[in-house]
Amino acid sequence: MRNFDLSPLYRSAIGFDRLFNALEAGQSQGNGGYPPYNVELVDENHYRIAIAVAGFAEQELEITTQDNLLIVRGAHNNEPAERTYLYQGIAERNFERKFQLAEHIQIKGAKLENGLLYIDMERIVPETLKPRRIEIK
């Protein structure tokens, strides 16, 4: 597992204020880090988000995209049962998580497996933006 320290970029980057503000805003969302998630680089052009959604059924989860924003919502459909807890360590609250997507990122699919919601993404760069080799004659 790798963690990245972005602080050296702050010292040498000029004109990227929006990018860093977006990164900081994503880290300090007001939902207290619930539910926890991982963002994985699968290979050069493929990414996967894994969100811990234990206790949510597939029909209680909603994934939408709009303007390069991925929104994942979880809402319990039923009324909470009257229970007496001696200790409650499993959160049962609804949530909304937002992820800012870079240009040319497309959602390829999602699956719910063993309490984790996996969202697979791919970066598809148009041919016009890819570097091309010019033949010298």
Curated annotation (Swiss-Prot):
Alphabetic keyword roster: Chaperone, Cytoplasm, Stress response
GO term, biological process aspect, one: protein stabilization
Coiled coil ranges: none
Keyword Cytoplasm: yes
Pfam families hit by this protein: HSP20
UniProt domain sHSP: residue ranges: 28-137
SUPFAM superfamilies the UniProt entry points to: HSP20-like chaperones (SSF49764)
InterPro entries, sorted: A-crystallin/Hsp20_dom, ACD_IbpA/B, HSP20-like_chaperone, HSP20_IbpA
Location(s), subcellular: Cytoplasm
CDD domains: ACD_IbpA-B_like
Subunit architecture: Monomer. Forms homomultimers of about 100-150 subunits at optimal growth temperatures. Conformation changes to monomers at high temperatures or high ionic concentrations.
Its biological purpose: Associates with aggregated proteins, together with IbpB, to stabilize and protect them from irreversible denaturation and extensive proteolysis during heat shock and oxidative stress. Aggregated proteins bound to the IbpAB complex are more efficiently refolded and reactivated by the ATP-dependent chaperone systems ClpB and DnaK/DnaJ/GrpE. Its activity is ATP-independent.
Family under the similarity heading: Belongs to the small heat shock protein (HSP20) family.
Protein's recorded name: Small heat shock protein IbpA
Organism: Serratia proteamaculans (strain 568)
Organism classification: Bacteria, Pseudomonadati, Pseudomonadota, Gammaproteobacteria, Enterobacterales
